[in-house]
């Protein structure tokens, strides 16, 4: 057990409440787990980790780096639950996501230093979201396909509405009565709706904050199947979402800038120019602290800009705060770019 200092570590025999220490050799322990005495077991409440708000594409520079990159990503993801990775189905690229530009820069640097991986990294991409602003009371969709032999048939009637709580991204409610849709097909409708939410209808970004209610439907004893109802659920959701006033959401970052008072005007003006909202200003240890909410898309390159405007005398920190609706003129540009227009 070690107490960590800036340039050294100190071995200690025991730790008390509130101590922060490093423990060596825990090969079976992962982030979020609780360690306790076997005789007095205790489990602390699990931590909630936010979803990534920024993504970059990463690819190995050579075939030799391919395997090392996979190992590095796996190890880093085990350590840091806020770091996520997936493959883009259309391009085949590996996409890594994190909580900010600096977060991903540090992870890529660790890949190079600790795992000897040389990789090409793309430009950061903001993880936008889509949601709806209006309820749609009834949308009916029938999936019907007839080829030689057994066909496909499923009819669903759904309603969708926005979820006001920001903590819930999706809900599914079943209100079918009288066996109009057999119980074994209900989860397929749910799965179809969730699949459709992965790619929103405005610009293909994941959707959030939607409640789907299955109202009614119909089936065929021979031609109906789980696949048919999944397709019907997916298509019904897409049709309903188009009618529900879809909007684009962007991640907002809580930004805190510490600056000498002489540069307060420059700092505030710069935040305002980035579509930011000043939340508070206070004094701390002889310096001024400016707190605000700024769209993540406007924070790229902020380190250099802040250094330039304050002669290197200001510093800042930021963390994800929430998602907010993108202004119409900005949303139109984002949607056009996503569609390649």
Swiss-Prot record:
Localization per record: Cytoplasm
UniProt keyword list: Cytoplasm, Elongation factor, GTP-binding, Nucleotide-binding, Protein biosynthesis
Gene that encodes the chain: fus
Keyword Repeat applies: no
Cellular component terms per the entry's GO annotation: cytoplasm
Spans traversing the lipid bilayer: none
Protein's UniProt name: Elongation factor G
Similarity remark: Belongs to the GTP-binding elongation factor family. EF-G/EF-2 subfamily.
């Amino acid at each position: 057990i070690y107490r960590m200092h800036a340039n050294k570590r100190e071995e200690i025999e025991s730790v008390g409440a509130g101590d922060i220490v490093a423990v060596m050799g825990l090969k079976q322990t992962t982030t979020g787990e609780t360690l306790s005495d076997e005789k007095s077991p205790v489990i602390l409440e699990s931590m909630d980790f936010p979803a990534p708000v920024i993504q970059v594409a990463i690819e190995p520079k050579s075939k030799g780096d391919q395997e090392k990159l996979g190992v590095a990503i796996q190890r880093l993801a085990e350590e840091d639950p806020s770091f996520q990775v997936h493959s883009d189905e259309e391009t085949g690229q590996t996409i890594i996501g994190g909580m900010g530009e600096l977060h991903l820069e540090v992870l890529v640097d660790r890949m190079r230093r600790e795992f000897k991986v040389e990789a090409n990294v793309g430009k950061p991409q903001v993880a936008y979201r889509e949601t709806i602003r209006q309820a749609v009371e009834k949308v009916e969709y029938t999936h019907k396909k007839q080829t030689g032999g057994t066909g496909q048939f499923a009819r669903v009637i759904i309603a969708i509405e926005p979820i006001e709580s920001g903590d819930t991204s999706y809900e599914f409610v079943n209100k079918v009565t009288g066996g109009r849709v057999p119980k074994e097909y209900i989860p397929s409708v749910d799965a179809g709706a969730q699949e459709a939410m992965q790619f929103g209808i405005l610009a293909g970004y994941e959707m959030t904050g939607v409640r789907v209610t299955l109202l009614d439907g119909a089936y065929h004893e021979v031609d109906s199947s789980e696949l048919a109802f999944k397709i019907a659920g997916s298509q019904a959701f897409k049709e309903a979402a188009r009618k529900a006033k879809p909007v684009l959401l962007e991640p907002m970052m809580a930004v805190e800038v510490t600056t000498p008072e002489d540069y307060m005007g420059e700092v505030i003006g710069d935040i305002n120019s980035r579509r930011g909202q000043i939340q508070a200003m206070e004094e701390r240890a002889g310096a001024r602290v400016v707190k605000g909410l700024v769209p993540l898309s406007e924070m790229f390159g902020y380190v250099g800009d802040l250094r330039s405007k304050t002669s290197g005398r200001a510093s800042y920190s930021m963390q994800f705060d929430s998602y907010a609706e993108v202004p119409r003129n900005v949303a139109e540009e984002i949607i056009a770019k996503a569609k390649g227009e």
